[in-house]
Amino acid sequence: ALWELLQAGKLYGDVLTCTGRTMAENLTGAESHDREMIRPFADPLIDRAGFMVLSGNLFDFAILKTSVISEAFRARYLSRPGSEGVFEARAIVFDGSDDYHHRINDPALNIDEDCILVIRGSGVVGWPGSAEVVNMQPPDAMIRAGKQWLPTLGDGRQSGTSDSPSILNVSPESAVGGGLAWLRTGDMI
């Protein structure tokens, strides 16, 4: 896969790596022979699939998982006339996965479809190793009513199998003073 990126000009081949050799030297002879498993860069399985890099006033950068944005999600959150592709939501903020698990069903949070679930303190500093905790579900009552997901935001990571529309790997993370550290439940994002 790295050889494909190098050939497509997406990696700098002349950078020195920890091996003492350049990236190009390390990748010499590393071409994939199974073109169904490692697709050529010019022939992707899905065009424009996967992820998008975002930036804004809450973070310098984060990753938006675009591959799971369904038409239903797009219609509900991203189709406001005059502001297509933009959504506004009320933040429900959790300080790590324990806080999320203890409070997600708290009726005082008043979680509804106009909310975004935020988990902070789960990046590489706040939770060494960067926890896989951004894949949060709505409260049980919403799930029973047929609502399987809400937008999520966090400074940790997420399983590749999660089908939740998510903004993850927020940086700088909250543990080092990033924007999520200042966010409070009820704030509009």
Across the structure, where does each feature detected by a protein language model lie?
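Catalytic or ion-coupling anion/metal-binding cores of large enzyme and transporter domains
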Residues: 1-189
